[in-house]
Amino acid sequence: MIPAGTVQPWRPASRATYTVLFVCFLAILFEGYDVGVMGAVLPALADDRNWNLTPLELGALRSYALVGMFFGAFLIGTLSEMIGRRRMLLLCVSLFSLTMLGASYAPTPAIFGVLRFIGGLGLGGVIPVAAALTIEYSPPHRRSFNYGLMYSGYSVGILCAALIAMWLLPSLGWRGVIGLGAVPMVLIPLMAWMLPESLEYLVGQGRIAEAQALADRTGHGRLPSQARPANSAARAAWRDVMSSMFARKQLRATACFWIALFFGLLLVYGLNTWLPTIMRKNGYDLGSSLSFLVIFSLASAVGGLFLGGAADRMGARGTVALFYLIGALAIGALMFRNSVAVNYLLVALAGVGSVSASLILTGYLAGYYPAHARAAATGWALSFARFGAMSGPLVGGYVAGSGLSFGWNFITFSIAGLAAALAVALLPSAREPVVVTRGGQQSNAEIA
């Protein structure tokens, strides 16, 4: 964010906000399909006699993309502050779409894993860049809701993966369902035409005239001619980001964000990968076990909007902590012999208390740090959280292959949810230095 003393209030026009939301929604939807399809096809991969994979090997195969996402999040998040958020978002979608096509033809698990790792680089970069663009082009009083709306594309993508797998897996096999992940390549030209560049990036690079022209097209208000990058060395993004995250006054917040997202993504990726398999082990057939993934995804999508609105009204910190707790309790309750209807309800609460809570927490994080470090700080936090994402499928695979009852999977994931809730509850509140209200007035506001 450019210092208040040197910048006239600028507010995005509704058309610009919705355009950015739409493009970022598409990018996140495609990512959700890529991530969700592995869980949807996992039972078919387990039955593939050509590869004969063990449960632990299946979990490892699922984790290759997550390793790539670890590197992609902080590399691309930081690079986007140097070479442009718009360019990096389009590049990331192109990369993971192409590798999905390649993975569908992989002759061996090793080649499949390499392609998934490369695609993971693009997957890891989408979230921090889309988060930064969405927060930047949203009015402050709508940030959490808009972020929830944008990120609901992730759950819609997972839902599409589950529905497509239920419909086409018997006829196309797992290779055909994975190959459909290349479809986004067709929409890249449309996304490139619609998506504006980040004003924060342009100003941070000293491209003031270009930033002003874009500001005139996408919003209301002017950048004064004397505007300069907020930091004294516009291209010293690395030093600025490190200072923004690890200064003494920010250290506790950074630690809490990172720990909460670690356990949050352990939940998200562990449940996305193993929920159909665990429910199948509990006596459900393949179609019924996949239906739990559908419920999980639907609830996550709707829950993101609900939590976003609640966070805008009551504060993100308390809202996210509460729903992590609710999700943990719901996951733990799945270990009991419940009716199908009760299990559907519990899975829905688990979706809201894992995916929805994590996405609202990511949006809160993106607004917590200075604007010039928004994408990079989000990327660094998500990179650390990828250790949790990588652990989720492996933990589920270990428990599934250990001979323990299926209930131990739910106990393990429930503990992760409790840890995430505690970390969010320990987050310090922060004050945004300047918020532009609906009337265009500037005031201090606490981020709760």
Task: Describe the residue ranges of each PLM region.
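Extracytoplasmic gate region of multi-pass secondary transporters
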Residues: G39, R248-G304
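Extracellular/periplasmic helix-loop-helix junction of adjacent transmembrane segments
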Residues: G39-F71, S288
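Conserved MFS/SLC helix-loop-helix module at the cytosolic interface between two early adjacent transmembrane helices
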Residues: F71-P109
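Intracellular cytosolic loops and amphipathic helices of Major Facilitator Superfamily
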Residues: M1-P9, M194-A253, V435-A448
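A membrane-interface helix-boundary motif in multi-pass transporters
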Residues: P170-G181, G401-I415
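Helix-breaking motifs and short loop linkers at transmembrane-helix boundaries and internal kinks
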Residues: G84, Y105-I111, P139, G315, ...
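Cytoplasmic helix-loop-helix junction between adjacent transmembrane helices
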Residues: L115-S152
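Cytosolic juxtamembrane N-terminal segment immediately preceding the first transmembrane helix
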Residues: M1-Y33
